[in-house]
Amino acid sequence: MQFNKPLRQGVLQKRYKRFLADIDFGDNETTTTHCPNTGAMTGCAEPGFTAWCSVSDNPKRKYSLTWELAQNNNGEMIVVNTQHANRMAGELLQTNLVPELSQWQELKPEQRYGKEKSRIDWWGVDQHNRECFIEVKSVTLADASQGYFPDAVSQRAHKHLNELMQVVADGHRAVQLYMVMHDGIERVSPAAHIDSQYAELCRKAASVGVEFYAVKCRASAKEIKLERPVPVSL
């Protein structure tokens, strides 16, 4: 995935009110930008980190800049915009990088399903004519090379796992796909130290047949690229 226009580089001053970040672009004026990330962003939004923002030409937008990437003090790139995880998952599903997630007869994004009419990130029909429901999560919380999800207690993530288990009970395939959006992460686990219930649900889901995969991406100011699968330990 390439960025349509060159990103503006600056220095993060602070992130606040979940959706806002102040960034200094070296013009003696701090600019308020849109932060497209509702998570805690632990280790991703420290003052002084380098930040890259895209620029919108839409005159109706209150904030013309969107914070896309951060670079921490170790030089590691982090994809801040969580929407890119789903886009990269779409690219992944068109490749053979993860054989179990390839060779689709049909593939569609953001489909409604189930009794509650929830929206799954990706729905497909695999080469064996089985329906497959894929939930995508962006992983940026790092402790050295260990990645964790979620970075805060997430009732929404609990709901998604319960729905994936119901998909399996209905006779279909269900996949939890972690897109690793932090250069330093080499493996992924549920964040039991943050959300113990989520970790328990992951183990339960795996025991009934929900599939777990993680794929690492590599970001630069020009593009985000798929790199390779990394281990998931439950």
UniProtKB/Swiss-Prot annotation:
Question: Record's InterPro entries?
Answer: SfsA, SfsA_C, SfsA_N
* Pfam families for this protein: SfsA (PF03749), SfsA_N (PF17746)
Q: Which GO terms describe its molecular function?
A: DNA binding
The record's section on Gene3D superfamilies has:
2.40.50.580, 3.40.1350.60
NCBIfam families the UniProt entry points to: sfsA
Provide the family line: Belongs to the SfsA family.
Listed HAMAP family? SfsA (MF_00095)
Name listed for the protein in its UniProt record: Sugar fermentation stimulation protein homolog
**Organism annotation:** Idiomarina loihiensis (strain ATCC BAA-735 / DSM 15497 / L2-TR)
